[in-house]
Regions:
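Acidic catalytic motifs of isoprenoid enzymes
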Residues: 1-169
Length: 169
């Protein structure tokens, strides 16, 4: 399978899994879209991992799979074949893989669904998940991680409120 096939699969995953982000990416110039489709597809796969099973162990294994894959990318080892990891390897630098690893580790909270103990803990979770993804996205587009993180945190608060409402109702 060619890398362009992987990127097309990533774009389709984003279109189906997060139509709002898909529409945001489609407003960019075509040459800027590929990297963001790959990054956002990774985010979808990682964010779904805690929810794939009611069995916590299965969800933990899935998150571990992603953590191992990102560690392979960071260490420049041979990366496991997956339609997201193969192109992701081509776009992430070492500092960006660190942010993705923090995202994965934060997602373990989703497995147990324990309440955040404080407002600060909640905002650390949002920063590690949404803030980190948008920080990497901004950098991939040639912008500042700081601006991307601010945008990501704002989006993360909105998404958290939306998800909390859906979980409550």
């Amino acid at each position: 399978m060619e890398l362009s096939d992987d990127i097309n699969q990533c774009a389709n995953l984003v279109k189906q899994g997060d139509h709002d982000r898909y529409r945001i990416i489609m407003t960019l110039e075509p040459k800027l879209r590929s990297d963001l489709f790959v990054l956002m597809a990774a985010n979808i796969e990682i964010s779904r991992a805690p929810w794939i099973s009611k069995e916590n162990l299965i969800s933990e294994i899935r998150l571990r799979w992603w953590l191992d894959a990102i560690e392979e990318i960071a260490s420049k080892q041979s990366v496991r074949r997956h339609f997201v990891t193969s192109p992701l390897e081509k776009i992430l630098n070492k500092s960006q893989t660190k942010l993705i690893k923090e995202n994965i580790l934060a997602r373990s909270w989703d497995i147990n669904l324990e309440p955040h103990l404080s407002e600060n803990e909640l905002f650390r979770y949002i920063d590690a998940t949404s803030g980190n993804i948008w920080a990497v996205a901004a950098e991939l587009l040639g912008g500042s991680q700081k601006i991307g993180r601010l945008l990501g945190n704002a989006i993360g608060v909105i998404q958290y409120c939306k998800a909390s409402n859906e979980l409550i109702l």
